[in-house]
From Swiss-Prot:
Molecular function per GO: hydrolase activity
Protein name: Probable lysophospholipase BODYGUARD 1
GO biological process: abscisic acid biosynthetic process; cell wall organization; cuticle development; cutin biosynthetic process; defense response to fungus; lateral root development; positive regulation of cutin biosynthetic process; positive regulation of response to water deprivation
Knockout mutant characteristics: Defects characteristic of the loss of cuticle structure associated with an enhanced accumulation of cell wall-bound lipids and epicuticular waxes. Reduced expression of abscissic acid (ABA) biosynthesis genes (e.g. NCED3) in response to osmotic stress (e.g. polyethylene glycol) leading to reduced levels of ABA and high sensitivity to osmotic stress and drought, especially during seed germination and early seedling development. Increased aerial tissue permeability to the toluidine blue (TB) dye. Enhanced transpiration. Strong decrease in total cutin monomer load in young leaves and flowers.
Keywords annotated in UniProt: Abscisic acid biosynthesis, Cell membrane, Cell wall, Cell wall biogenesis/degradation, Hydrolase, Lipoprotein, Membrane, Palmitate, Plant defense, Secreted, Signal
Residues of the AB hydrolase-1 domain: 185-439
Lineage: Eukaryota, Viridiplantae, Streptophyta, Embryophyta, Tracheophyta
Pfam families (alphabetical): Abhydrolase_1
SUPFAM superfamilies linked: alpha/beta-Hydrolases (SSF53474)
Amino acid sequence: MGFSRSLNRTVGVFVFFILDIVDFLLCFTYKTLDFFFESEWKPCYCCPPPEAKPISAGGNRGGKMIVSERSGDYSKVVSLTRTKIYLDEISDTLYSRPSLLTKLTKLVKCFKKDVVKCCDESKKRSPSTKKTLLTVNSTVVEKLQRTPRWSDCHCTFCTSWLSSSNQSLFVNVQQPTDNKAQENVVFIHGFLSSSTFWTETLFPNFSDSAKSNYRFLAVDLLGYGKSPKPNDSLYTLKEHLEMIERSVISQFRLKTFHLVAHSLGCILALALAVKHPGAIKSLTLLAPPYYSVPKGVQGTQYVMRRLAPKEVWPPMAFGASVASWYEHISRTVSLVLCKNHHLLEFLTRLLTRNRMRTYLIEGFLCHTHNASWHTLHNIIFGSGSKVEAYLDHVRDNVDCEVAVFHGGRDELIPVECSYGVKRKVPRARIHVVPDKDHITIVVGRQKEFARELELIWRRSTTPQLHSIN
């Protein structure tokens, strides 16, 4: 066991050093391609913040601005066209992802430091080179950039939101034929997924009694499925929550509702429970990514290293590491797979002779790289120090049943995360399903899971069973 782990780490050092170089080269490749297709150099997060050139957005329509904020030993610098952002919602993992290559380049930078410093001081004395810096701590998003990037999919499915003036999330609704549902259930999918994760598995398998009493609402998160995919969005927690509140809670006038969430969706579900404590009737979490952050450790970096440990085995950990650490390699994967998802669906049907349903491919590939990259860092990693506070609030202030399901063979999010939820919320019921992983916790056992959900919803009508400790 010790030898295999050492071998895994040793091979990982070599493999990820090669990937560091590849990502570095792809950075220049995409800058060139972006300029060729869009007549503009697009900024990326591997660019050193001190070299950014901030300008004022001014009053020009569509003008760009650079937002800068000092945080510790580095600056957060964001180039955007949005009129509304939240710097406190931006994860430092976007800017600080140290690699062997960056450590080597720091040696060169240290050598040039004195020369550069002298040049900078001389420039500061010259009025003509004075920079206008716009520092923003908290603002709000008001417009969506509606033009998809050249590297994103332009098919009718992925761009259907562009033809609508209503910039709301897509919500798949199933309700009783008489439109007289007694209760509401909101489903929130996970990372690289969509509402089809629920509609193709659970919705057809609910009992007739449940279908006649509950209104089911499965939402496509911002940047996924049929929902808007603004390429200038930073996909922060506040943006996601505001869109869910506007598109689901306000749109359907939900006063009370049950919440069912998977993986990434668990973070959003907990945040919703904190904002609407009196509206939650039950809270069901599947594979919640909760990591208890040790004291004195930066939460964002800790969660990133737990989820993406830079190891080549198992394959799930390797894939998560590549997606998390390499902005340009992950964009290449998106360019090859997401932009050609219709071809992949066709080939899958052809090779399996239509014996395999392709809804998982739709959920996995119908997003933009900008959406997946920012959601991963700003929600999953950026919430490292927030989930614990959310759980404390749910324990003390949200009077509802809490149920947690986890696959015993989940290689992406370990089952220890669910036990951590139990320690924070003692009344939570933990269900570890043997021989199931991150996806098969639902897919393949949808009938059984549908019955389990119905039992939770029925039980939630008895308050004394889940009174707050």
